[in-house]
Design a protein with these regions (language model features):
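Cytochrome P450
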Residues: 2-477
Length: 477
């Protein structure tokens, strides 16, 4: 047994109270890790309690670097799981759908219903294809006018908010200041999902409540009941419109009020499998998954992308000069600072990775955050650079991309379980950002109102999920 293994065993053999107790770790300057000691051979030790600390959630990347370099498959006895942190190892597991299953049935089904998240193989592909066809290719392109219309409507509302001297939007002479999350990013992706699904406008406020409750309900027992109740409310509502949509389809409209395509609920209501219409439960589960996939991912992408671009003026100028660079900014943002941390898997057989034996049935956490910062794949991974030559910027592929020195990021995963909302999230973030830029003259961050780092002066790190507040100001003329 190495000295590192001995340290971990000693920690695990402590009393349960000691092992699980909250440990205070000092907040370190961005890029530095707390010194938790070293083994005799110089290997840095890692106390798994750091993974629950404010320091880790504030800036996890120094700790992911320790895991990648020294514990690429880390047996975390505190959380009873194995952390997998290298890009190549994670992609191998994602593509092996038989050997590394998704989360067990029932872990999210109470809130989201029986979704494809809990399926594998043929049944997973069948479920994915039921709605996936409506979120890619020409079908997705037909929905872009609706996305543009909603973005403009939300920005139009800023005028009223500023006149009312809103807490989050106000004017000062020729300058308007606003908080982007409250005035746009929080609600925009949910409005888009409502629109493309085909929810009537009068039901969208209720839908927003259902969404927030279901997402909150995935986080733990304290909010699980509320999430289940919200999901039931959504299913009851959908049941009331299924037959109506089969008889009288509804359509998405462009900014001039012209129909562009049938909404997704109508499409699902018209879908048959083996000669039978989908059940209300199946339709609701598909809707719940689309809602979850297209919400927080997009909100985080918009917030992080604008924060990063505005703090890298040369790259923001490149986006202003060429709208095609928004796609590059989107992909680099998700590589650099995704709001999606990873996906759990359970191995169906005993495996050994990097000398670590993982018994069948173990919980293995595939840490996409860490894979996106793997120095073996991406040069200077902690630098934000929309023109890096090692990142693939093209169409999102279920097969991933790894050619000619370029690799796809892992924010949406890869393989059979690539995030179902990846394509619509991309369009929401890019189309919405293009319209934001067209409606704001000389946008910049209002640093006086932004959260500060531990020195009280420099900007706070982006953290493990995404920027929660982004105060902007721009010229009105």
């Amino acid at each position: 047994m190495t000295s590192v293994e001995s340290f971990i065993e000693d920690l695990a053999s402590s009393t349960d109270a000691d092992f699980a107790s909250v440990k205070e770790f000092p907040l370190m300057p961005e890029g530095d890790a707390v010194d938790m000691g070293h083994a005799q051979d110089g290997t840095p030790l890692l106390d798994p309690r750091i993974l629950d600390s404010p320091e880790f959630f504030r800036n996890p990347y120094p700790y992911y670097r320790i895991l990648r370099d020294h514990y690429p498959v880390f047996h975390d006895k505190l959380h009873n799981c194995y952390w997998v942190t290298r890009y190549d190892d994670i992609t191998e597991c994602y593509f092996d759908d038989e050997g590394f299953n998704t989360i067990p049935k029932g872990s999210s089904s109470g809130v989201l219903g029986n979704t494809q998240l809990e399926l594998s193989g043929v049944e997973h592909r069948r479920r994915r294809n039921l709605y996936g066809q409506h979120l890619v290719g020409q079908s997705l392109q037909a929905r872009i006018p609706a996305i543009e219309k909603l973005a403009n409507e939300m920005i139009d509302a800023w005028e009223t908010a500023a006149n009312d001297d809103s807490e989050f939007c106000s004017d000062n002479g020729n300058t308007r200041q606003l908080e982007l999350s409250s005035m746009f990013a929080n609600e925009f992706p949910i409005r888009v999902v409502c629109e493309v699904l085909g929810f009537p406008k009068e039901a969208q406020s209720q839908f927003y409540y259902w969404y927030n409750s279901m997402m909150s309900g995935l986080g733990g027992s304290a909010t699980h009941k509320q999430g289940v109740e919200a999901r039931q409310g959504l299913e009851d509502y959908v049941a009331g419109i299924v037959e109506e949509r089969r008889k009288d389809p509804t359509y998405l409209l462009d900014q001039d009020g012209n129909p562009t395509s049938k909404d997704i609920i109508t499409k699902l209501c018209e879908t048959k499998v083996d000669g039978d219409f989908l059940s209300t439960e199946e339709i609701t589960s598909n809707i719940a998954l689309i809602v979850g996939a297209g919400g927080e991912t997009t909100r985080g992408a918009i917030m992080n992308m604008w924060a990063l671009l505005l703090r890298h003026p040369d790259q923001f100028d490149a986006v202003i000069g060429d709208g095609g660079n928004w796609d590059k900014a989107f992909h680099e943002t998700l590589r650099h600072s995704s709001s999606i941390g990873g996906q759990p898997r359970h191995n169906t057989f005993d495996v050994e990775m990097h000398g670590v034996k993982v018994p069948a049935g173990s919980l293995m956490q595939m840490v996409d955050f860490a894979a996106n910062h793997d120095e073996r794949i991406f040069k200077q991974p902690e630098s934000f650079n929309i023109f890096r030559d090692d990142l693939y910027y093209g169409k999102l592929l279920r097969s991933g991309y790894r050619k000619e020195g370029r690799c796809s990021h892992m924010a949406f995963g890869v393989g059979p379980h690539l995030c179902p909302g990846a394509w619509i999230s991309h369009q929401e973030a890019v189309v919405g950002s293009k319209i934001l830029l067209s409606r704001m003259k000389n946008p910049r961050i209002n640093e006086n109102k932004m959260p500060k780092d531990i020195d009280g002066k420099s900007p706070a790190p982006m953290g493990i999920i995404s920027v929660r507040e982004l105060w902007l100001e721009y010229d009105l003329s």
